[in-house]
Amino acid sequence: MEPEAAAGARKARGRGCHCPGDAPWRPPPPRGPESPAPWRPWIQTPGDAELTRTGRPLEPRADQHTFGSKGAFGFQHPVRVYLPMSKRQEYLRSSGEQVLASFPVQATIDFYDDESTESASEAEEPEEGPPPLHLLPQEVGGRQENGPGGKGRDQGINQGQRSSGGGDHWGEGPLPQGVSSRGGKCSSSK
């Protein structure tokens, strides 16, 4: 092919294909460690700022769906749906799934404190939940006899197991027959 024909073919190909190698006036996209930070839709670019300021994009031929971080419905990402803390239990039961299913874009539900939650929590007494992990059941019971030095001090941590079957130090189950939790020797033969 002649050089002039090759140049014409390259021009024609450049119109149909937008590969970086076909368009010498555009630099190829950066690759490797010198490339800029990855695109994050929640960070505004200069083009997004212009769109927000003037109401129209910098390029008149830009498509709404491909320009900037606004979605097809005009939402700025990430989208957060705010619900009051008083509605948290209702959300956990059923409505949260329905809210997210009916929302047109990917969203995150954030709960915020509302006044009804504060007044309700002040009126209620604190609920007694399970004991903290670092406390032994004897300490939670509050009985002096099971406290340090009391008559219940020789019992295992797991109150359901008595000295006949014993229990290992963490209450994980009975020890093998003849094994003492005090470190004594086993009288059975192996």
From Swiss-Prot:
Pfam families, per the entry: Ripply (PF14998)
Region Disordered: start-end pairs: 1-72, 110-190
InterPro entries assigned: Ripply_fam
Annotated TM spans: none
One of the GO BP terms on file: pharyngeal system development
Stretches with biased composition (Acidic residues): 111-128
Assembly: Interacts with TBX1.
Domain-level remarks: The Ripply homology domain and the WRPW motif are both necessary for its transcriptional corepressor activity on the transcription activator TBX1. The WRPW motif is required for binding to tle/groucho proteins.
The protein, known as: Protein ripply3
The organism of origin for this protein: Homo sapiens
